[in-house]
């Protein structure tokens, strides 16, 4: 048996969709092997891979591990005060995504357009108590 995990954006997902060829290859691979997803996205942002029965999920840049039924195997949460500190001190240097335990949405700074994201201006707007954190460096043009 082999185990294979894929990223989504720019790897499996192109132009917000998965090709039929990739879907067929995944189904064939899964007949004797395990196929999972490994992404920075939270669980609520898998809308463009609907219909792919992943055998495991590595979400939130490794902070959340789920089995095929989406039961938590392991999670690494951050304290709200630590997330607040990081957000307040580093938001000018990096695009910071603050992901919460809420599956319906999560909060972020201002650089990604996803239907399940809610933009915040102040960290105090976040009412959830469990946090994951992601950072993305702004892309720099090489002109």
Regions found by a protein language model. Name each.
Residues 2-16:
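Asp-based phosphoryl-transfer active-site loop
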Residues 1-2, 30:
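Extreme N-terminus of proteins, especially the signal/transit-peptide cleavage junction
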Residues 20-117:
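Active-site phosphate-binding/coordination module
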């Amino acid at each position: 048996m082999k185990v294979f995990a894929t990223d989504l954006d720019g790897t499996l997902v192109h132009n917000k969709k998965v090709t039929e060829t990739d879907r067929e290859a995944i189904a064939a691979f899964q007949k004797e092997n395990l196929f999972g997803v490994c992404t920075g996205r939270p669980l609520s942002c898998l809308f463009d891979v609907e219909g792919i029965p992943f055998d495991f999920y590595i979400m939130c840049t490794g902070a959340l591990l789920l089995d095929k039924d989406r039961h938590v195997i392991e999670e690494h949460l951050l304290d709200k005060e630590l997330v607040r500190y990081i957000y307040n001190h580093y938001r000018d240097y990096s695009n910071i995504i603050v992901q919460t335990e809420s599956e319906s949405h999560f909060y972020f700074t201002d650089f990604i357009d996803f239907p399940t994201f809610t933009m915040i201006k102040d960290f105090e707007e976040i009412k959830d108590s469990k946090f994951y954190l992601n950072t993305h460096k702004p892309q720099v043009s090489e002109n």
